[in-house]
Amino acid sequence: MRSDVMIQARNLTIGYRQGRKVKKVHTGLSFALRQGELTCLLGPNGAGKSTLLRTLGGTQAPLTGDIFLEGRSFTTYTEKEISRKIGLVLTDRTMAGGLTVFDLVSLGRHPHTGFFGRLQKRDEEIVYQSLDAVGVAFKAGSYVAELSDGERQKVMIAKALAQECPLLLLDEPTAFLDVVSRIEMMDLLHELAEKKGKTVLLSTHDLEQALLLGDRLWLLSRDKGLVCGATEDLVFSGEINQFFARNEIIFDRKNGNFRPQKREGKKITLKAEGELFFWTQNALTRNGFQLEEQATLVLEACSPHAFRLWENNQIKKTFTSFEQLIAFIKQKELFREREDILPEL
C-alpha cells in the first residue's frame, strides 16, 4: 500500500441487512483515497453514494470485503480512534435544535478532550476558527432550530472541521447553499486538501465545480459500478460523456459542460477572442447555430458592444449589444432554406 494512501478498499460489497435478507447496492468495489486530494463522488440519485460514504465513515458495516485506514484494518479501530481520524457529514437532519451553534460545533472537539469533555481555551479557539471558515461565526450564539437549511449545513461542516481529522467525508455538502456559498465551500475544501494535506471525499451533483476543483472523480451508478480516475483523464477518455450523456445531451470537452445536441443548425464562422468568443458562442449555439471555419455567414465580435455580420465578404448587419444580436438571430424566417445564407435586408 502506498504511504500516501489514507483509506483503501478491496473487493468491497456495500448494502443493507434487513433481518435475514441482504440488499446489495454494489459489489466488487476497489479504490483508494490519497492524502492531500479532493475527490468528488458523482452519480444519479439512488446510485448508492450515501451508502458508500456511510460505509467508509464507519456508521454502516460493509457486507463483505476489506477497508484499510492508514494501512490498518478498519475493524481494529475503536470508535474513539475513528472519531479522531474521520470527520463525517451526512444529509440526515440533525436533531439538535435545543443546542446553540457553538455547542453543536464544540461536539467536534470531544475526541480530543479529557474524560469530562471540558473545552480548553485552545478547543474554543478551534471551534470559532471552524465557524469562521464556513462563514457562520456570527451565528455562534443562535439555536440550531433557528437556522436555515444552508446555515445548518455549514454548521455541520464546521463541526467536522473542529474534529481536526485527516479524512473528511461529506454527503452533498453544498446541497442547500446558494451559488456563491457553494463556490466558497468547494474552494475551502480544496484548500484543506491542497494546503493542509487532508483527504476529502464529497458527493455532489455540481459537475462544474467538481471538474474545476476535484483532483479525482469517482463516477458511481447502479449499472456501471464505480469508475475512478484523475479528473482530466476521465474527461479525455470519454468516461464523463458515457456516464452522464443522454440522447440529446452531450459533454462539451472544450467548455467543460453539458449542452443540448442540436441535430441540424445554421452554419456560421465566429471571429472573436477570449471570453468574448466563449459568450458569443454561447449565444449562437443556444439559438441553433453551429460553428464552422469556412461558413458563408461570418460573425465578427469586436467587443460586447460591437458585432458585425458578414456574408460573402460584405457587411450585412451590425449590432451594439448581445440583446440586439440575439433578437436578430431568433428571427428564423429571415433564413432561407439554405440555412447558411442570409437574404438581403
Q: Each predicted region: which residue ranges?
A:
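Conserved structural motif at the start of ABC-family nucleotide-binding domains
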Residues: 7, 26-28
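Catalytic Walker B motif of ABC-type/P-loop ATPase nucleotide-binding domains
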Residues: 168-171
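Helix-to-loop junction immediately C-terminal to a conserved catalytic motif
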Residues: 57
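Conserved ABC ATPase signature
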Residues: 143-147, 151
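Conserved ABC ATPase "signature" region
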Residues: 121-139
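The feature captures the beta-strand-to-loop junction immediately N-terminal to the Walker
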Residues: 42-44
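Conserved ABC transporter NBD signature motif
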Residues: 65-73, 82
